[in-house]
């Protein structure tokens, strides 16, 4: 060797984010809105560009009056219980917002797992919007990792003296503490009966509880694992199975996070590889009648 140094390529990788945005959020309100200014405008991305700058167009935002004798609120529902991280807020942002003051100011934040029992997170002041079409979110609410499927914002005051209040957009983020990315993927068919189940572990999980069965409403504990994989043993052919992973960490405030129910269907029969190589050659030891018997 002549000790020549061959410089390698430079590679890179990106670590996963601290938190992920919650998708498919449903927004409702007890407020009275007109035209296209309903609460859904705060979660549908209307008015946001690729740089997360919000427009100053009124129809891209929510604006409402409180019902008589009631405090105005806007409520958000997710598709399950999440460990909430932050709430990003784009306040009401029409061109003359600095004069009108329709944006929310003092807000009470509450959360719930079932939509019936509510816990107050606290009172927060939302920063006023700029009234420009380059406006980016300027309020971040720490949601403290609470478990919730619902979040409600109750309006205590706005930035002006008007009887209407509004928001442009909100975004909730969550910590991925539940199991995800199952293998076999959810709904997979023709799965071999000796398949080992695997998944991407929840971020805080110490133990994984594996529930498995043929009835999605009556899954039983099949076993536990300290790794994100589980061998269920030989399952039956031609059967649809349902499974769920509960992520467990006794040191956390919420000790168990139940995952979604996934499914897979096993193949109807086993395919024998190289079956055509069997014949009636006794001397070669490849006789089919000595190897395969119905």
Identify the function of each model-found stretch.
Residues 1, 157-159, 247-251:
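Surface-exposed loop/turn motifs at beta-strand-loop junctions within extracellular Ig-like
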Residues 2-16, 177, 250-269:
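Extracellular fibronectin type III
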Residues 7, 16-20, 52-122, 135-178:
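Aromatic, loop-rich ligand-recognition surfaces of beta-strand-rich domains
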Residues 16-35, 267-294:
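Extracellular carbohydrate-recognition regions
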Residues 80, 147, 186, 193, ...:
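Surface-exposed loops/turns
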Residues 195-205:
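Conserved aromatic anchor
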Residues 207-238, 250-259:
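Recognizes extended acidic, P/S/T-rich segments that occur
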């Amino acid at each position: 060797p002549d000790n020549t140094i061959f410089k390698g390529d430079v590679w890179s990788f990106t670590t996963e984010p601290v938190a992920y945005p919650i998708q498919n959020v449903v927004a409702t309100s007890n407020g009275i809105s007109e035209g296209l200014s309903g609460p859904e405008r705060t979660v549908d991305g209307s008015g946001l560009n690729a740089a997360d700058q919000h427009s100053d167009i009124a129809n891209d935002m929510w604006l409402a009056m409180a019902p008589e004798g009631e405090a105005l609120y806007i409520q958000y529902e997710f598709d399950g219980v999440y460990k909430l991280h932050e709430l990003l807020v784009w306040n009401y942002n029409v061109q003359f917002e600095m004069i009108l003051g329709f944006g929310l100011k003092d807000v009470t934040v509450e959360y719930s797992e079932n939509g019936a029992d509510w816990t107050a997170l606290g009172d927060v002041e939302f920063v006023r919007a700029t009234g420009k079409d380059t406006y980016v979110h300027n309020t971040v609410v720490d949601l403290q990792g609470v478990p919730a499927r619902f979040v409600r914002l109750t309006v205590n005051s706005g930035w002006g003296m008007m009887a209407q209040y509004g928001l442009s957009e909100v975004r909730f983020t969550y910590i991925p503490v539940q199991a995800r990315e199952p293998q076999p993927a959810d709904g997979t068919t023709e799965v071999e009966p000796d398949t080992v189940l695997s998944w991407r572990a929840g971020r805080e999980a110490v133990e994984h509880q594996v529930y498995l069965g043929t009835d999605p409403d009556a899954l039983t504990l099949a076993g536990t694992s300290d790794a994100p994989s589980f061998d269920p043993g030989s399952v039956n052919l031609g059967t649809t199975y349902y499974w769920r992973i509960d992520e467990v960490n006794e040191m956390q405030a919420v000790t168990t996070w139940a995952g979604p129910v996934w499914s897979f269907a096993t193949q109807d029969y086993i395919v024998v590889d190289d079956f055509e190589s069997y014949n009636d050659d006794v001397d070669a030891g490849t006789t089919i009648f000595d190897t395969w018997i119905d």
